[in-house]
Amino acid sequence: MLSFGLCAVCGQVTTGKNFGVISCRSCAAFFRRAPTWSRRFPECVKASCAIFENGKFKCKKCRLKRCQEVGMDVKKIQQNRDLISTSNMFQKRVTLIFGPAHSMSTFLGRPSFLLHCEPELASHSKTIIDVSYLVDVARKIFEKDATISHKSSNYYNSLELLTLALDAFRPKDIDKKLTRLTKIGKNESLLMWEQSFLRAAEWFSNLPSFMKLEDWMKLDILKSSWLAWTRLEKRCEAADYQKSKILENGVFMCGNGSCLAIAEYEVDLSWCTNYTAEQLKYYLSPDSEGQKCIEDLIELSPSSTEVNFMILQLTLHHAGKKSQGRLLEATENIIEAQANHLHSYYVEKVKMPNYSARLAKMMKINRGIAGEMRCRREKNQIARVFDIMKVEFSDPEMFELT
C-alpha cells in the first residue's frame, strides 16, 4: 500500500488527500458524515483531547475541531457518488434528454388491447352458433335420476354424495385412457365445451338440495357457473395426475380423458376470428395462471371431499352474485348447508377440529380463480366492443368466460 505520510487529524498512516488535507480514510469518512448529524455534541471540557489513543477515537467534538483546523472544507464534499445514485442520476438525465422508454403501446399511441387492432379485420356480421340443444340435454338430465343413487349406503351426507359422483366421472385406468391433444381448433373447442357443460349438469344433479330448486334456477346456475366448474375441476384433476407423475408439469386436463402440453399444442382461431393468435395475445389467458393454481393444489393436496366443497362454493357463489335476488338466497343456503357437512367431515371423519388454516388456503385458491374469471369477462367485453370475434352463441351469457 502506498503511503503519503501521516494523517493530519489523528496521526495514522494515510494513502492520500481528502477534502484538501492529507488524511486517513477513517477521518475522511468521519468528516463527510459530520454535516448530517442531527444533534450537536456539547463543548469538550478539556478542549484538547487526544484524537486517537489506544486504538480508539476519543472525542468527536475535538476530532471535528481538529479536522477544521487542519483545513478540511465542507464545500469539497461530493454527493451522489455511490453506484446506485449515479445510475439513477444517469437515468434521469437520459429521460430528460430522450424522454421515457417507449413500450409498443406508448410508441404506437394505442393501449395494449388495441395494439394489433385492424379495422378491416373486424367482424361486423356474426355467425351464430346454436347451443340451445345443450340446454335441452341439461334439462333432461335434471329430470331423470341422479348418476349416483341417493339410496346408496356409502355416503354420510350430500357432500359425500357429490364426492362419489365426481370420482365416478374420472377414468379408472388413467394411463391407457388419456389422449394428448396437439391441436385445438373448432371441433376440439366445441367438443370440450359440450363435455364440460353436460358433466357439470350431471354433477349438480347429484345434489339433492340443488334438485329441489325451481327449474329456471337450476338452469340459470348451470349456465352461469359451468365454466367456473370446469376451470377448477380440471385443475384439480391435473394436480392429482401431476402429483402422481402421470402428467408432467405444464400439461393440463382439457376434456373428458384428454390433456394438452402448453409448450407443444397448436391453436387454430380462424373459425372464430380474423386475427392471428399473436395479435390476440392480450385476450388470451397466460399459461402461468393455470400452472400456479395447480402447484398450489399440489401443495395443499385436498381430499375429494374438500375438492367438491371448493367447486360447490366457487360455482354457487359466482352464480348467486351474478343473479342476485331469490337465486342468491338459494345458493347461499346450499353453501351454508354444505359448509356444515364439511365441518362434520373434519371433526368426525378426519379428526381435525382446527381446520381454519386449511380452509383459508382452499378459499385463497377459489378467490384466485374468481379473479381470473373477472379478468376474462372484462377482456371478452372489450373484444365484443371492437368486433374481434366473428362468431356469437345463441346464449351469450353461457360463454362469457371462455
Swiss-Prot record:
GO annotation, cellular component aspect: nucleus
Membrane-crossing segments per the record: none
One Pfam entry name: zf-C4
Ranges annotated as NR C4-type zinc finger: 7-27, 44-67
Domain NR LBD: start-end pairs: 154-402
DNA-binding region residue numbers: 4-79
Subcellular localization, as worded in the UniProt entry: Nucleus
SMART domains reported for this sequence: HOLI (SM00430), ZnF_C4 (SM00399)
GO MF term (any one): DNA-binding transcription factor activity
Gene3D superfamilies associated with the record: Erythroid Transcription Factor GATA-1, subunit A, Retinoid X Receptor
Keywords, comma-separated and alphabetical: DNA-binding, Metal-binding, Nucleus, Receptor, Transcription, Transcription regulation, Zinc, Zinc-finger
Task of the protein: Orphan nuclear receptor.
Entry similarity comment: Belongs to the nuclear hormone receptor family.
UniProt protein name: Nuclear hormone receptor family member nhr-96
Native organism: Caenorhabditis elegans
Organism phylogeny: Eukaryota, Metazoa, Ecdysozoa, Nematoda, Chromadorea
